[in-house]
Amino acid sequence: IYISGAFGKFILGGDDGVNDIIPPAPNDLISEEMYYTSKDGTADADHFLGIKNGDMANLAGNDNKITYMLPAMGGLSAGVSHTNKSAAGDADTTELGASYTMDAGGASIMIGGVTGTTENSTQDIDSQQIGVQISTGNATVVLAQSEYEADGDDEQGTSAGISFKVSDAMTLGAFTSEVEDDLSSEEYTNTGAEIQYTIASGLKAIINVEDYDYKAGTSGGFSDNGTASKLTIKATF
């Protein structure tokens, strides 16, 4: 649900907050990214890692929240999100973000950043991200850096992605990411590629291949590496 006007835009509900709306991220260029890990105890299973790329952690998930976006001011965009997790307020999440878009040398450049905090009884959970997006012709490149801090976590992530529209029917994408936890010595790297192909109007095939490596460090998890692939068929009506 949203309400918009000269005052800006209010968004209510379980949608993502400004962490997903504002800053550019390499994930935005890939339609069906997996960031795969296969064994128990790795980054997906027990969440030993709060981030797996250069994108900010989605601290509030799909919980109900209110987001306010300021009215457009030239190339500037800014907003705030708040998630009221409990009546006591001991697990609320607040996010602030801003971005600026400009033209330079025939390219469109966007620079954006976001920061968020979830209140916690032991140590607040904090995550930040800054990203740069450059678009020219049929190509778009995004570079991003993120951080995640919580009780027992001090993580830094970087990622880069590129998307190229070959034709009206085909788009190619690729990305690479790396995350390190200074406290547990965990490391996660992932490099992937994607092909999007429009078979017919409303019907699209998407092929993804990713190569990943997870080092558990002292986290108590299981180190893991491998290659994952996926075929997705999307139909829209």
Where are these regions (language model features)?
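Outer-membrane beta-barrel proteins
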Residues: 1-237
